[in-house]
């Protein structure tokens, strides 16, 4: 299944992506997005964004793709709870601790392995699947042959970044 996935840094770009026919959007949560200097969504803005997208039949994936330190765990837990309350469709993560905490708080929410997890082989895709990820985001440095080998290795969604 193909999916047109668009990055969104603010409501303006989100509205444009939905209007242009995106099937899904991904956006940054205000504290745990790797794009710290970009516009990211507060908890309140996230609720509005998800409501608008779901009304339009568009999925919303939230990036929680920073490396997290112990002192940040309470804030991360609150961010995960806020995203769950907003009814996001998946998290995109790179830190296994974030994946674990997400599973503890909202076990039913799909996890996507960020390109920062560097799943670059069939073995990596198989491991991601075994760890409960539903999708792996493959890096742009992979060849078509490598991508084919990964996609044929196991039943996990693949996304090309």
Language model regions located:
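Non-catalytic helical/linker scaffolds that mediate oligomerization, partner binding
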Residues: 1-161
